[in-house]
Amino acid sequence: MGKFLSKIQLSTLTCFAMIFWNEPLLAEDQDYGLTIQGESIDVIDMHLHTGTWDALTEPYKERYSERVPKFLRFTMKYLLGSGLTSEGILKQMDKAKIRRGGVFAVYSPDTTGIASNQFLQQQINDHPERLLGFASVRTDYWNIDGPEQLKELESVLGNSNMVGIKLAHAHQQMRFDDPRFDGVYEIAGRLEKPIYVHTGTSPNPYTRLEPPYVDPKYLEDTIQRHPDTQFILGHSGYDSFKVALTYLDSCIELAQKYENVYMEPGALGARKAEKVLTEYLRIIKENNLVDRVIYGSDGPQFPGYTNSHLERFVEAMQASDYSTAEMRALLQTNFEQLFKLQN
């Protein structure tokens, strides 16, 4: 009986999720931002994903489908597909009262799949005031087509709504200390496009777990060689595989040594990471690095995630005695200053 009720509950939840994804966008006069102690914070979520079900790898589809009962997994193509379009992303941002967000292209054919630069451009073109693009580059045949990939990357970054670059070394099977990819960092510096670098482990299939792929200390020589490039250490070294702050010390050390190093806390506001979030925020504050952290969620993932991630993050900041000014810096102005945006 319990299993039967559980299936009914899960089925209801799945149906609710499908309805949630397909709710209409909120009115154009929607009020965005948070009000903390009477002051407004115009939150920016720099870490959002787009894509399609068909472009995901089969192992990743299986992992993603674990969220719903087996007899409803046929719905995942439609559920996920609508959620990762620009319309789906904007709905989740609206629910969280987030006006602006960064959206990533992804080239991880061995782990999660592909959301190409061209697809990303299609999704964000009609929303330049709200969706900011982070281009990526395919690296799996780098020894053969590296120069062509760099040329394409530079061309894509010529679009005004492409504000940065995203790399995921553990997903793309790239060591942090591999000098073959210096061309990517050179382009980032020359074009003044900050580069987001995934650090820490991932629970997704076939991602690398060895330190040279996940510990940002292996990136230090690259940072030294490219002082004009702004590096954002994604996930702040969060060890999602072990649910621990395993590589945060490396991130802290790099941010303290180099003015061109920032951190992003994507996924640390997820339910899974609740036990380490407060510790993370305490460490950031104790090391006087609030001005080096740029908020991101790693959303939208599933209906309500973008909002719940932000809610947990804000609650944890308040519990950690962050001032309103510190919260505004982390949630809004650090991004605006680094990316030279006008509010």
Regions found by a protein language model. Name each.
Residues F4-L10, E23-I44, A55-K95, R99-R100, ...:
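Mid-to-C-terminal alpha-helical segments outside catalytic/metal-binding sites
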Residues S11-W21:
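Bacterial N-terminal signal peptides
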Residues E28, L34, R99-R100, Y107-E210, ...:
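Active-site gating/metal-coordination segments in enzymes
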Residues V43-M46, F104, F134-S136, K166, ...:
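Active-site neighborhood of phospho(di)ester-bond hydrolases with catalytic His/Asp-centered motifs
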Residues I44-W53, H198, H235:
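Histidine-centered divalent metal-coordination motifs
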Residues H47, M93, L120, I165, ...:
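Conserved, mostly hydrophobic/aromatic
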Residues G51-D54, S108-T111, D140-W142, Q173, ...:
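Active-site environment of divalent metal-dependent phosphoester hydrolases
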Residues S160-G164, D177-I294:
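Catalytic pocket-lining loop regions of alpha/beta-barrel enzymes
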